[in-house]
Amino acid sequence: MLLDKPMYKLPPLCFWRTLIPALALLITISLLSKFNYPLPDYTSILLWYSRLDPLLLLSFLRNGEIPGWLWLPLAMLLATLLAGRVFCGWLCPLGGLLALLGSVRSRPIPAWVDRLKPFRVPWLLFLLALMAWGSGWTLYLSPFHLLTEELNRIWLGQIPWLLLAVVFSGLVIFPRFWCVYLCPTGLLFSIVSRWRLLRAKPPQGCIHCGRCEKICPTGAADPAASQTTADCLLCGRCSEKCPVDLFDFVNHRSGNPALAAGDVGFTRREVLRSGTALLVAGAAAPLLMKPTAANPLRPPGALEEAEFLSRCSRCGRCMRVCPSKCIRPMPFSSGPAMFLTPYIIARDARCELTQYCQQVCPTGAIGHLPVEKTLMGLAEIDHSRCLGWSQGKLCLLCQEQCPRHAIESPDKIRPQVIADLCVGCGACENGCPVDSPAAIVVKPQPSRSRK
């Protein structure tokens, strides 16, 4: 009798296609929401998850570092060489958001969008050239950093302009427009996918009904072609909608010259456009990299300013995890090189030296540095404004507030800064009772670490 019972069947592909990307988005949001004091150990999952992005690896390699997690992005690149854009279709949290958007309001891909395809490779090369020349904006556009920064803006009560633009493009043009045409990580995977081993091939006896072309979220399915393009997300929609037979995944090296040719080659126009993009990047790099504001007070462990700006992806995780919320994004008036990078206004809030910002930074812009070697800045006392120095009044609030005991007062009236102990946390400036400017101010230093 047991044999007469129907066997359990796995859920259909459409179930997993919706569940897994949605879980990727949910995990990212839930982990980021736990970036509070005290910081749970399991939040490091988000750091490791972010390391799937090969752009992050390129950022480390650019600075001459070979990270210990090298195998993670290499594994994703190998998976892409095997089957295509696995990460974009199944593991990307921003892709999960856009997939949900597509399930709510699906739109056919407009014909005019194809005119943008020749500019995708030049756009990617432009961004990679900016990264090579020391700009952190390329990483900002990658899915993990963009999503976490925009979510952080929501938590700060600000408008997530870029995320709204991504969603708006999905509503107006088609849901995966960002993934196909603008996302640097997606474009990099698309380039690698040109050499993928397995490719989806239309079934024998294709009647050219066009259903696969209409249902494909990236426009990778073409019934007139012998295979899907490098933008295939392996979602399986074409296979589900095909009225004739299932699409086959075939080895493009199986001897079929039509399949072997694939979409690997680059046209002459593509090469010329790419060269132009490199020239434009060379001209734009100085504008995007040149600081237009004075040396700001950075979080503890921040690298020297030029290297910090080249590494910081503006993801906002340090701001999210800061217990005193002293870390803020720099305003637009600071210029494109510094815009949205983290800085501290000590008068408004002090750094508690928890070093959580060092633990969550995915790019190494905020390095792991012991407190005793940290030098965010150096406190300086304006004797003409200090109550103890100018009026002989007993105050010493700066001495009481200092967590490093870097302020002494031999005469019990006039405070003095011990430069060898001061780390520039800003507790003294934050607690000073003198109206702005405070009588004691933390001045950023050229070097941010003690030898």
Where are these regions (language model features)?
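Non-ligating segments of multi-cofactor redox enzymes
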Residues: 1-451
